[in-house]
Amino acid sequence: MALPSALWWPG
């Protein structure tokens, strides 16, 4: 996705 994975996945 356009958003960074850090926003969805912890750490």
Swiss-Prot record:
GO terms for biological process: L-tryptophan biosynthetic process. Keywords: Amino-acid biosynthesis, Aromatic amino acid biosynthesis, Leader peptide, Tryptophan biosynthesis. This protein is involved in control of the biosynthesis of tryptophan. This is trp operon leader peptide. The gene is trpL.
